[in-house]
Amino acid sequence: MSGQESGMRVLVVHSRYRSAMPSGENRVVDQESEALARAGHEVRRFEKKSDEIEHWSAMQKALLPARVVWSRESHRELAATLREYRPDVVHVHNTFPLVSAAVLYACRDASVPVVATIHNYRLMCASGNFVRQGAICHDCMGKLPVRGAVHGCYRGSRAATAPLVVATIAHRKAWRSLVSAYMFISAAQRDLHLALNLPSSRVFVRHNMIPYRDIQSAPRDPVVAYIGRLEEGKGLRLLMAAWDRYLGSSHDPGLRLVIAGAGSLDREVAAWASARPSVETLGIIPPDQVQGLMSRARAVLVPSVWEETFGLVVVEAMAAGTPTIAAGHGSLIELVTPGTDGALFQPSDPDALAGAVADVAAHPEKYESYGRRARETYEQRFNPNRSLEHLLEIYSFAITHPVSGRGALEQTLGQRP
């Protein structure tokens, strides 16, 4: 090991999500890598970009399902990178769709410890979010996810889901035996993964890092904001139903709803918003405009139907001194203290969300107070310096407590790669 005193040598592995879709995972990877480099550690990225898929040949696209299960290219390229770079630790983030679990075996063969941040539920659920047909579904938790293929849980397609199910089954033992430290981003997410029987001594909970930001002193507008992907699992249909109920309960709504983001519900949201003067849609906006919107809003809405693994936008809002109104389940109940720095509402209940929005309109001073306390929560619980220290502690654990993992591939596929 090169030693933490003189700086660790870290290799970050990540399959990047499409840039057309806002990705909290991409932001976390970038922010952590930058924080490590600023602290004097040597960081190299091993990344594949989903944006490249649209430029592939028809043959390459036809072979993508096989690559989801096992990417020979990633295995070969990472093995070469490990020989040349010789990192102290490899930090694996997302492996779907272009990296695959092949990278775990490459690290095993090079005797380099792996730290894995588990950002979603894909080790158990083909969709990655435990949502099927707009409702929470735990049918595959603790089991092989074959029901995901039956229901076509990924993008509503059995053909698209099948490679994910095969990959999960083929590499489940590898995920259990080739990782030296697992980082879950909330206790709620960790608890749902207990069904995998991961070695408890190697399991850590570490919230995502949010860079320190000076609070912007700007007057608050009569606005509540939604910032994120426009997807059913994120609660967009719930939000639209709740807003209509809020409008129906008041002749003078008093608030506007601003929606920033993109996703599969783009057209549906745009059509709905166009018929409502109180709603504005912005599409994807740059980070500085996101910060400006958060700083001006009276509250940020997080209506997620799925059980969020973390809720990055909640802590970003806290950093801006803005309270959050969030669905009361998953990790969100760990982040928001109702009556102190925000509010929680009954998940999947549009009337409950409408009532919370009406409360913002009726009691702006209360939400100003919540915002001040939200900033205090950010500084006390989500301090980025402490987050970096915790990350380095987990790296050190992985380096000093490596796993051999020998035999994982033989047990799983019957042969060495």
Sequence positions of predicted segments:
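Short glycine-rich donor-binding/catalytic loop of glycosyltransferases
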Residues: 305, 322, 326-333, 347-348
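A short, well-ordered alpha-helix in the C-terminal region of glycosyltransferases
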Residues: 352, 359, 366-381, 387-393, ...
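Membrane-proximal helix-turn-helix segments that form the acceptor-binding/catalytic region
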Residues: 109, 138-182, 191
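Conserved acidic donor-binding segment of nucleotide-sugar-dependent glycosyltransferases
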Residues: 338-339, 343-350, 359-364
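Nucleotide-activated donor-binding/catalytic signature segment of Leloir-type glycosyltransferases, i.e.
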Residues: 267-288, 292
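Carbohydrate-associated surface elements
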Residues: 188, 209
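Conserved donor-binding/catalytic core segment of Leloir-type glycosyltransferases
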Residues: 183, 208, 216-244, 258
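Acidic donor-binding loop of glycosyltransferase active sites
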Residues: 295-309, 322
